């Protein structure tokens, strides 16, 4: 085992120092320093040239790998693990196939649902378009319906106007009101209202009468109470003048003085009472053809101020000052409320009937001449009244139609229409000339007048009554 140090071959040959039991371990070899200068030969020293291989240090905590022969248990474990890995790989493959199938089914269902949704959306769009069309159609039908309604209303209004115009032009005894007791000449409601008002006034005036009543007045009132006034319709008062006119036409060649006088019923004279129109016509038959009407000789209405105080601010006399009665003949030949104005205006008809009823009730209450002992004349002061009437100026009068027109111009006439029984008696009509002689009638200009006229002074008094009565109302 000894080698010489001087031989170069022995210097480069490695020397293994590892034990024989560990052939796999690396040996630590130490190479000689060839480049180093060789030292001077020292005597009695030996230098080894063997290469030593040092094994690597094992890592801490781990056993060193040992090549042990495989045993039966390990072989079984390895086989089991191998089989497990194979089964697991097969299971994974199966699951992947199932997943693919599920995904395909899901895609098919999703495609079907998308197709259904698309169809539903198309149907919704169609339904929306149909709904819009129906809305437009409904709107068009509603417009047509409104047009038809308007046309129907216009036709109904036009028919009503035609019916109303036919009613106004009809001169028959059609009932204007709704009480079924009124005709075109008389209104039972108005007569009853004035009779009740007169009875109440008589009861209140009896205890405070200033003078006693004459026996003739008492007998007259008792007679009127015991025998109620019988009101007949205009048809019962009609008279056939056909033969009279024919006789008058044949006798006109003879003496005019023997010509019979034919009169139309005035409508204000009642059955059993003297008629002012008939008396005036009998007294002066010749004045009717030779002399003009006395109404044209009356002073204008502007001169009312010299008989009555000046009107108040609410009076509307200035508007009606130029109204002069143009009806020189009797416009209400068939009775009160039968003239053209009364037929055209129901308020005028009610006013005319109320005035006629008030005049009739006043005539029943008063004395023999209807004045009641006042300024209109009575039995006791007939002589003095007849003497003074010749010297006095004839009063200014208005026709019934002009009176209504004058009063209706007052701003409070609508409110006053509900209180006719309070102010209608204040309108003074012409005195009842049943007991007047022909000279007095001629002096008082009572010939050739309409059947009913109202004093202008009393009209002014009623206008002032409206101002006082409705001063606070707005």
Curated annotation (Swiss-Prot):
Subcellular location: Nucleus
Disordered as annotated region, ranges: 1-82, 201-242, 282-317, 429-449
Function: Iron regulator crucial for the adaptation to iron starvation and iron excess, but is dispensable for virulence. SreA represses the expression of hapX and the siderophore system during iron sufficient conditions by an iron-sensing mechanism, while hapX represses sreA and activates the siderophore system during iron-limiting conditions, resulting in efficient iron uptake and inhibition of iron-consuming pathways.
Region (Basic motif): 72-91
GO cellular component, one term: RNA polymerase II transcription regulator complex
Reported induction: Expression is highly up-regulated during iron starvation.
Keywords: Nucleus
Region (Leucine-zipper) location: 95-102
Disruption phenotype: Leads to reduced growth and decreased conidiation during iron starvation, but not during iron-replete conditions. Showed a reddish pigmentation of mycelia during iron-depleted conditions probably due to the accumulation of iron-free precursors of heme. Results in a lacking activation of the siderophore biosynthesis genes sidA and sidC during iron starvation and in a decreased production of extracellular ferrichrome C, but not ferricrocin.
Primary localization: nucleus
Pfam families: bZIP_1, Hap4_Hap_bind
Disulfide bond positions: none
Segments of skewed composition (Polar residues): 1-10, 287-307
Any one GO MF annotation of this record: DNA-binding transcription activator activity, RNA polymerase II-specific
Similarity-based family: Belongs to the bZIP family. YAP subfamily.
Keyword Nucleus (UniProt): yes
UniProt KW Nucleus keyword: yes
Name of the encoding gene: hapX
Domain bZIP: 67-108
Record organism: Arthroderma benhamiae (strain ATCC MYA-4681 / CBS 112371)
Name recorded for this polypeptide: bZIP transcription factor hapX
């Amino acid at each position: 085992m000894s080698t010489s140090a001087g031989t170069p071959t022995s210097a480069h040959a490695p020397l293994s120092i590892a034990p024989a039991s560990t052939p796999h371990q690396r040996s630590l070899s130490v190479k000689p320093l060839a480049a180093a200068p060789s030292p001077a030969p020292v005597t009695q020293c030996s230098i080894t040239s063997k290469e030593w291989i040092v094994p690597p240090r094992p890592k801490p905590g781990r056993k060193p790998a040992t090549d042990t022969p495989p045993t039966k248990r390990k072989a079984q474990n390895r086989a089991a693990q191998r089989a497990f890995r194979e089964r697991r790989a097969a299971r994974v493959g199966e699951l992947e196939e199932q997943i693919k199938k599920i995904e395909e089914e899901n895609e098919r269902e999703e495609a079907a649902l998308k197709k259904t949704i698309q169809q539903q959306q198309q149907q919704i769009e169609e339904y929306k378009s149909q709904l819009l069309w129906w809305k437009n159609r409904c709107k068009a039908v509603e417009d047509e319906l409104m047009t038809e309604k308007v046309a129907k209303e216009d036709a109904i209004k036009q028919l009503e106007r035609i019916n109303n115009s036919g009613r106004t032009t009809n001169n028959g005894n059609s009932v204007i009101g709704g009480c079924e007791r009124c005709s075109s000449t008389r209104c039972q409601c108005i007569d009853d209202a004035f009779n009740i008002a007169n009875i109440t006034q008589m009861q209140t005036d009896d205890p405070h009468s200033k003078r006693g009543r004459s026996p003739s007045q008492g007998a007259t009132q008792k007679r009127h109470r015991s025998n109620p006034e019988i009101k007949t319709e205009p048809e019962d008062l009609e008279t056939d003048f056909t033969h009279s006119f024919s006789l008058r036409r044949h006798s006109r060649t003879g003496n005019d003085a023997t010509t019979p006088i034919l009169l139309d019923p005035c409508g204000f004279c009642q059955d059993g009472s003297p008629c002012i129109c008939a008396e005036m016509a009998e007294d002066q038959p010749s004045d009717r053809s030779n002399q003009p009407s006395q109404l044209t000789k009356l002073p204008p209405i502007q001169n009312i101020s010299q008989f009555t105080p000046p009107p108040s601010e609410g009076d509307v006399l200035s508007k009606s000052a130029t109204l002069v009665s143009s009806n020189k003949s009797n416009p209400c030949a068939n009775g009160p409320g039968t003239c053209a104005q009364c037929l055209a205006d129901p308020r005028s008809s009610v006013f005319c009937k109320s005035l006629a009823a008030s005049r009739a009730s006043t005539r029943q209450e008063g004395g023999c001449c209807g004045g009641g002992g006042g300024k209109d004349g009575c039995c006791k002061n007939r002589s003095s009244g007849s003497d003074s009437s010749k010297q006095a100026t004839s009063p200014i009068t208005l026709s019934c139609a002009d009176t209504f027109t004058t009063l209706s111009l007052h701003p409070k006439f609508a409110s006053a229409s509900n209180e006719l029984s309070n102010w209608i008696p204040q309108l003074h009509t012409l005195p009842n000339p049943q007991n007047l002689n022909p000279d007095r009638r001629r002096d008082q200009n009572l010939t050739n007048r309409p059947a009913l006229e109202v004093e202008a002074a009393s009209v002014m008094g009623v206008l002032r009554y409206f101002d006082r009565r409705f001063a606070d109302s707005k």
